């Protein structure tokens, strides 16, 4: 499964202090590699760099994330997109393993979603499977504001699981009705 530079750095920031340049949001990266001098850079890679003599050229493939590790990069200027600095002297294998864990997490999630669809699992199960990736509460509602599935929402104050059935949920229904996507979908 391919991931974006922004998503990888989002997860890395949970484990390491880091600085980043502008990061791409398109999922183009597929695996990490340790950078070695005089090797041809390959598209779609996350390169871990610890070499003090590393010089970024403008003639490299576009879909690469450069992850520079060590105090020697503390003042390195982030001049190009998809550059990230971990300004600590951390063993490369620890960062490499963390990146591998991120790819494994998303691969397992993707596989579980595919398996659930093959089993014809419910929408509720799909929401539950997504909890490891998107921890926020989620709710899927129909055009008539009936709650089809939800995760981590307290629905006890809604009669018949319908948004708008109580005064507490009127504001939610009003804001949903103001959304241009609702009107577009409703009148198709």
Residue ranges and their predicted role:
Residues 1-188:
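Alpha-helical/coil-rich non-catalytic "connector" segments in signaling and regulatory proteins
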């Amino acid at each position: 499964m391919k991931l974006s530079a922004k998503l990888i750095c989002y997860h890395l920031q949970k484990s390491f202090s880091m600085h980043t340049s502008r990061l791409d949001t398109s999922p183009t990266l597929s695996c990490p590699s340790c950078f070695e001098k005089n090797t041809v850079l390959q598209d779609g890679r996350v390169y871990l760099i610890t070499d003090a003599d590393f010089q970024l050229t403008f003639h490299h493939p576009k879909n690469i994330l450069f992850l520079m590790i060590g105090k020697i990069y503390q003042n390195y200027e982030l001049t190009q997109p998809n550059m990230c600095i971990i300004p600590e002297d951390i063993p490369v294998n620890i960062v490499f393993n963390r990146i591998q864990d991120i790819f494994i997490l998303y691969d397992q999630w993707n596989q579980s979603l595919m398996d659930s669809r093959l089993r014809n699992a419910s929408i509720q199960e799909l929401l539950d499977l997504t909890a490891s990736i998107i921890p926020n509460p989620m709710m899927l509602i129909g055009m008539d504001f009936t709650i089809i599935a939800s995760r981590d929402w307290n629905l006890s104050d809604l009669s018949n699981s319908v948004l708008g059935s109580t005064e507490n949920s009127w504001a939610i229904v009003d804001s949903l009705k103001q959304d241009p996507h609702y009107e577009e979908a409703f009148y198709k």
